[in-house]
Regions:
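Conserved residues at the C-terminal ends of beta-strands
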Residues: 29, 64, 94, 143, ...
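Conserved CoA-thioester-binding segment of acyl-CoA-metabolizing enzymes
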Residues: 1-72
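Crotonase-fold acyl-CoA enzyme core
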Residues: 110-192
Length: 192
C-alpha cells in the first residue's frame, strides 16, 4: 500500500478480565480525502478482521476516522469525517473493472461477521460506504456534528455493502427508502 490507510493500535485494558484483554482501535487514515474508502482500505480492514478473529486477547474493535489535518496558513479547514464513502477518484484512475473486486469481496461483511463486539465512533460525515461501515458495527456512537447519508443515488447507483438491508433493519422500510431514493442526509440526533 502506498499510504497507511488504516492505523491499528491494540490497547491493553487493565483489569478487564482475569486473563487480560485488549481493544483494537482502527483509525481510517485518509483525512485529506475525508477518510474516503479505497481498495487499500478494504484490503486493510479485511486483513484486520482476520487478525482480530484469531487473536483471543482482543476483546473488542473500535473503528474511527482520523481527524482533519490542520491546514497551512490561509488554507481552509476540512470538516471531520468518519468516512465520506468510496473514493470515487479511484474508480476514475483505475477503472471500475479493476476496483470492483475489492468492493464485491465486501470488507463490511467481514466486520459484520466478527465474533467480537465492534463499535463505530462517528465524528463528522459518514456517507455511502462510511454509513455502511458504521451499520456493519454492533454499536454506533456519533458526535453531535455527525451526518449520515446514502448519496449513491446521485451517481445513479444504489448503496452496496449491505447498506439497504442493514439500514432497513434499524430504521424501517419507509425511512430507508426516503434516504436511499433521495440521497438525503440525516443528523446524528435524527439517525440515532
Amino acid at each position: 500500500m502506498s499510504e497507511e490507510v488504516l492505523i491499528v493500535e491494540d490497547r491493553l485494558v487493565e483489569g478487564s478480565s482475569p486473563n487480560g484483554g485488549a481493544i483494537s482501535i482502527w483509525t481510517l487514515n485518509r483525512p485529506d480525502k475525508l477518510n474516503a474508502l479505497n481498495s487499500d482500505s478494504h484490503i486493510a480492514i479485511k486483513e484486520q478482521c482476520l487478525r482480530v478473529e484469531s487473536d483471543d486477547n482482543i476483546r473488542c474493535v473500535v473503528i474511527r476516522g482520523a481527524p482533519p489535518q490542520i491546514p497551512e496558513e490561509g488554507g481552509k479547514q476540512k470538516p471531520p469525517a468518519f468516512a465520506a464513502g468510496a473514493d470515487i477518484s479511484e474508480f476514475l484512475e483505475k477503472g471500475s473493472d479493476d476496483v470492483r473486486p475489492f468492493f464485491e469481496d465486501n470488507a463490511w461483511e467481514a466486520v459484520w461477521n466478527l465474533s467480537k463486539p465492534t463499535i463505530a465512533m462517528v465524528d463528522g460525515f459518514a456517507l455511502g460506504g462510511g454509513t455502511e461501515l458504521a451499520l456493519s458495527c454492533d454499536i454506533r456512537i456519533a458526535s453531535d456534528r455527525s451526518t449520515f447519508g446514502q448519496p449513491e443515488i446521485n451517481l445513479g447507483l444504489i448503496p452496496g455493502g449491505g447498506g439497504t438491508q442493514r439500514l432497513c433493519r434499524l430504521i424501517g422500510y419507509g425511512k430507508t427508502m426516503e434516504i436511499v431514493l433521495t440521497g438525503g442526509m440525516v443528523s446524528s440526533d435524527e439517525a440515532l
